[in-house]
């Protein structure tokens, strides 16, 4: 077993799907080796007496036989299997679990709703960047977890008896996507939420994070439709109107919505609209991980880092042997430029963070080859697992690195949706200039500079005589000024 002792597995027997995650511990973080998900729809097999049908149990056992094959290489002490809402509820859960344990060869633990909520929060805390004080929402098949917390500590935990499968069976049983069904589903969800809303609001949050298939589906829809990745009530209402327009569940077609997710999408959407309305949520983003990640990090006993993005960047720099001193040098110059123009350009703090992150990784392409290094950098960043960064933020970083030098590909900056296109252009300009002025790879050779913005015009003022004393530098800046002018970015250098 010595060679496999760094492997860990987490299995989540959910009400809608069964999931298995297999990871390897690498430098205080986890590297995903296997993810398997199977739609089992266990909750749909509950009858009015809360007994699971034989068919539903057989679907579950069949899935576990697939999982069992992969578990043979992992020490039992490094496997955790948990069951959630449906198996908490089912009167014959014991029958299902006995056979499940026999198939898997390890214990299956039915966890309480509060424990599920705590584990979901831990998974989010380990994998999701942004503000420390958060509200986490996870809409499962038969339960919905709502958790507030700061850093690694939860402040309130709730597990509510509503989910996308149970709401589908209850409010969309006729498969009709009419306004009446949505109204009934939302009203019922708000009634379930009302008793806990005050306590959640009392603890408060600076950022709201969604950690479920419904939120994942929304993210995929918004990416496919070129919207930014922030989920708002307005966008949810638009999608509801689109669903109503489709008329029936089997005719539901929305750009970016997969067939696999379509069945429980309207019911999940109704619950999410109720949560947004009842808790007055302004905006939600997708979490980097949830229950399974919480289980894995719990087995590894890893502390929650204050800044997940920084940990990710450090790990990538080590792995690809990036020159950390140079990355810091470029970041320092870029930060200085950013601070000088942020008021004129109305830039937000998150834009500064993303610019600095791009600086930290800008030489990653050299690990492949100097030729086409920006393209290699963009490919690597687009395809690496970057905990703490959302999919849209990864796309922005890749786009910035693609455009760090040479003529600018304006269309790529407009295709990302982490920030408005104009902001992506502005960050790109600052990154390119920072790379140029830190290119000598010595702190004492970075000149004192001022950068002023007047609408799109950038005016860079260098020390007197600098351009005369640095003919190569002068040539590089003249070329850069020309490249920026091609895309209507005026740059004056004095």
Swiss-Prot record:
It is an enzyme of class 3 (hydrolase). GO terms for biological process: guanosine pentaphosphate catabolic process; guanosine tetraphosphate biosynthetic process; nucleobase-containing small molecule interconversion. Its EC number is 3.6.1.40. Pathway: Purine metabolism; ppGpp biosynthesis; ppGpp from GTP: step 2/2. GO terms for molecular function: guanosine-5'-triphosphate,3'-diphosphate diphosphatase activity. Transmembrane segments: none annotated. It catalyses: guanosine 3'-diphosphate 5'-triphosphate + H2O = guanosine 3',5'-bis(diphosphate) + phosphate + H(+). Coiled coil: none annotated. Keywords: Hydrolase. InterPro entries: ATPase_NBD (IPR043129), GppA/Ppx_hydrolase (IPR050273), Guo-5TP_3DP_PyrP (IPR023709), Ppx_GppA_C (IPR048950), Ppx_GppA_N (IPR003695), PyroPPase_GppA_Ppx (IPR030673). It comes from the Bacteria. PANTHER family: EXOPOLYPHOSPHATASE, RETROGRADE REGULATION PROTEIN 2. Catalyzes the conversion of pppGpp to ppGpp. Guanosine pentaphosphate (pppGpp) is a cytoplasmic signaling molecule which together with ppGpp controls the 'stringent response', an adaptive process that allows bacteria to respond to amino acid starvation, resulting in the coordinated regulation of numerous cellular activities. NCBIfam families: PRK11031.1 (NF008260). HAMAP family: GppA (MF_01550). Belongs to the GppA/Ppx family. GppA subfamily. This is Guanosine-5'-triphosphate,3'-diphosphate pyrophosphatase.
């Amino acid at each position: 077993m010595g060679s496999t002792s760094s492997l860990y597995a987490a299995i989540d027997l959910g009400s809608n799907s069964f999931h298995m995650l297999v990871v390897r511990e690498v430098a205080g973080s986890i590297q995903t080796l296997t993810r398997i998900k199977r739609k089992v729809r266990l909750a749909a097999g509950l009858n009015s007496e809360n007994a699971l049908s034989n068919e539903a149990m057989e679907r579950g056992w069949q899935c576990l036989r697939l999982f069992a094959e992969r578990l043979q290489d992992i020490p039992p002490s490094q496997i955790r299997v948990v069951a959630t809402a449906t198996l908490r509820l089912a009167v014959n859960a014991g029958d299902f679990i006995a056979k499940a344990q026999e198939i898997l060869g390890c214990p299956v633990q039915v966890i309480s709703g509060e424990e599920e909520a705590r584990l979901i929060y831990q998974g989010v805390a380990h994998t999701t960047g942004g503000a420390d004080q958060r509200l986490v929402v996870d809409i499962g098949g038969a339960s919905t977890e709502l958790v507030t917390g700061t850093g690694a500590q939860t402040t309130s935990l709730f597990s509510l008896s509503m989910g996308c499968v149970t709401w589908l069976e209850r409010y969309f049983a006729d498969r009709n996507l009419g306004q009446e069904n949505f109204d009934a589903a939302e009203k019922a969800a708000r009634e379930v939420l009302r008793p806990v809303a005050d306590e959640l609001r009392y603890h408060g949050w600076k950022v709201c994070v969604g950690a479920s298939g419904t939120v994942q589906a929304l993210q995929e829809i918004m990416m496919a439709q070129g919207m930014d990745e922030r989920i708002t009530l307005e966008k949810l209402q638009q999608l509801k109107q689109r669903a109503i327009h489709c008329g029936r569940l089997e005719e539901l077609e929305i750009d970016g919505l997969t067939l696999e997710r379509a069945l429980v999408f309207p019911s999940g959407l109704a619950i999410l609209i109720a949560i947004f309305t009842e808790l007055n949520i302004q905006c939600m983003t997708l979490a980097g991980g949830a229950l399974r990640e919480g289980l894995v990090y719990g087995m590894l006993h890893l502390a929650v880092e204050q800044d997940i993005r920084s940990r990710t960047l450090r790990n990538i720099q080590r792995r690809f042997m990036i020159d950390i001193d140079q990355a810091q040098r470029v970041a320092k110059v870029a930060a200085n430029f950013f601070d000088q123009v942020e008021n004129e350009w109305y830039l937000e703090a998150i834009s500064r963070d993303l610019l600095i992150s791009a600086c930290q990784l800008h030489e990653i392409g050299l690990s492949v080859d100097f030729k086409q290094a920006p393209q290699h950098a963009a490919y690597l960043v687009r395809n690496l697992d970057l905990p703490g960064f959302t999919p849209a933020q990864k796309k922005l970083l890749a786009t910035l690195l693609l455009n760090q030098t040479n003529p600018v590909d304006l269309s790529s900056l407009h295709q990302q949706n982490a920030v408005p296109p104009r902001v992506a252009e502005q960050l790109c300009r600052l990154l390119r200039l920072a790379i140029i002025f830190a290119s000598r790879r010595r702190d004492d050779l970075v000149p004192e500079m001022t950068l002023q913005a007047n609408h799109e015009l950038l005016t860079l003022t260098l020390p007197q005589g600098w351009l005369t004393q640095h003919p190569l530098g002068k040539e590089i800046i003249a070329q850069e000024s020309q490249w920026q002018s091609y895309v209507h970015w005026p740059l004056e250098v004095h």
